[in-house]
């Protein structure tokens, strides 16, 4: 995948979630939750501040993150893979 996000944008590949209930029933459709965790695939150069300087991002390629899937999150298919394009501010935590 050859993609370079701009500014404070981050490309994330959503992690797979277990699609079975605690009782072993396979969940489909709206019953199956989508994960809000994923792996960072690419990061932009950073946020441009009012004084023109660039503030580097806190996340790096390979980080596992928890994100808020809100209004500003864009879903795209790149090389047949669904990825999310979001601002660093939509990330809530880095999982170690």
Curated annotation (Swiss-Prot):
Stored PROSITE patterns: CHAPERONINS_CPN10
Gene3D superfamilies: GroES chaperonin (2.30.33.40)
GO terms of biological process kind: chaperone cofactor-dependent protein refolding
GO molecular function: ATP binding; metal ion binding; protein folding chaperone; protein-folding chaperone binding; unfolded protein binding
InterPro entries: Chaperonin_GroES, Chaperonin_GroES_sf, Chaprnonin_Cpn10_CS, GroES-like_sf
Gene Ontology cellular component annotations, sorted alphabetically: cytoplasm
Entry keywords, A to Z: Chaperone, Cytoplasm
Keyword Methyltransferase included in the entry's annotation: no
Protein biosynthesis is among the record's keywords: no
Subcellular location, record wording: Cytoplasm
Database matches in PANTHER family: 10 KDA HEAT SHOCK PROTEIN, CO-CHAPERONIN GROES
Described function: Together with the chaperonin GroEL, plays an essential role in assisting protein folding. The GroEL-GroES system forms a nano-cage that allows encapsulation of the non-native substrate proteins and provides a physical environment optimized to promote and accelerate protein folding. GroES binds to the apical surface of the GroEL ring, thereby capping the opening of the GroEL channel.
Subunit structure: Heptamer of 7 subunits arranged in a ring. Interacts with the chaperonin GroEL.
Family note: Belongs to the GroES chaperonin family.
Protein name per its UniProtKB record: Co-chaperonin GroES
Species whose genome carries this gene: Shewanella woodyi (strain ATCC 51908 / MS32)
